[in-house]
UniProtKB/Swiss-Prot annotation:
It is an enzyme of class 2 (transferase). Keywords: Cytoplasm, Methyltransferase, S-adenosyl-L-methionine, Transferase. Transmembrane segments: none annotated. Belongs to the methyltransferase superfamily. PrmA family. Methylates ribosomal protein L11. This is Ribosomal protein L11 methyltransferase. It is found in: Cytoplasm. GO terms for cellular component: cytosol.
């Protein structure tokens, strides 16, 4: 069935007023969207920030009159409306549309990420089966891609790999499929641990090959390879801990870092690692190196 969609261009200060007003005039859903592709990272505790330029989208039953909606909004807010528009959108099979947009992706020479509803494009390649999720990483983000390509370029046979902040487990699983002897994943989120375990089982990874821990339960170790795709702030503050988790001569790859943060993160690791040139993609960077 079709829907009437109302769009308002608002500031963060207007958000609550217009959200309440739209619900009061009959909206069945209200959604906030970034109007200018402006990222928000590492917000202050107990805050839910909005973008400085936000689109507020509201859905109404198809027979709603947009002019009446706008008139009621003016009455309820006591002000002229910000930039606004209304359009009828057709319903569709959203699940099918979403699935069609997620295709197999190649990283480096050998590695593919393949959703369950697709055949592997190259049967003899290293194929990691992973369906897209909402929270933990599927290879579509530049930072994940940078880490996957780096792993594909390493000689991982016989190594122990630590995936710090494992999320979906995609990096640890990729390392195992690329030849690592064993992998360890750690994350502060219990759901991430479960997602990693489920994805490992889907890819035929034996339980003894992948150990998963909350940080407080992780044993002392020094890995041959450490990958961490988290945020710049934690990467800097945890630099002594992460450096200590890599054996002398071992390898490190870090991402989740905006381009303008790259030099600061690199500086936090320069004393302990011989660093490679920073790799940049779509405003994000990867920092890698070898433990001194």
């Amino acid at each position: 069935m079709p829907w009437l969609q109302v769009r308002l261009a608002i500031s963060p200060e207007q958000a609550e007023t217009y959200e309440d007003a739209l619900l009061e005039v009959g909206a069945v859903s209200v959604t906030f969207m970034d109007a200018e592709d402006q990222p928000i990272f590492e917000p202050d505790l107990n805050t839910t920030p909005l973008w400085s330029h936000t689109h507020l989208l509201a859905l109404f039953e198809a027979d709603a009159d947009p002019e009446q909606v706008f008139a009621h909004l003016r009455l309820l807010t006591g002000a002229e409306l910000p930039e606004h528009q209304a359009e009828v959108i057709e319903d569709q099979d959203w699940e099918r549309s979403w699935m069609d947009n997620f295709q197999p992706m190649r990283f480096g020479r050998r590695l593919w990420i393949v959703p369950s509803w697709h055949d592997a494009p190259e049967k003899d390649a290293v194929n990691l089966l992973l369906d897209p999720g909402l929270a933990f990483g599927t290879g579509t983000h530049p930072t994940t891609a940078l880490c996957l390509e780096w792993l594909d370029g390493q000689q991982l046979e016989g190594t122990q790999v630590l995936d710090f902040g494992c999320g979906s487990g995609i990096l640890a699983i990729a390392a195992l499929l690329l030849g690592a002897r064993e992998a360890v994943g750690t994350d502060i989120d219990v759901q991430a641990i479960e997602a990693s375990r489920d994805n490992a089982q889907r890819n035929g990874i034996a339980d003894e090959k992948l150990a998963l821990y909350l940080p407080e339960h992780m044993p002392a170790m020094q890995a041959d390879v450490l990958v961490a795709n988290i945020l710049a702030g934690p990467l800097v503050s945890l630099a002594p801990q992460l450096s200590g988790l890599v054996r002398p001569g071992g390898l490190l790859a870090l991402s989740g870092i905006l381009a303008e943060q790259g030099e600061d993160v690199a500086a936090a690791y320069a004393a302990d690692f011989e660093l490679d040139p920073i790799v940049v993609r779509d405003g994000w960077v990867r920092i890698s190196g070898r433990r001194r």
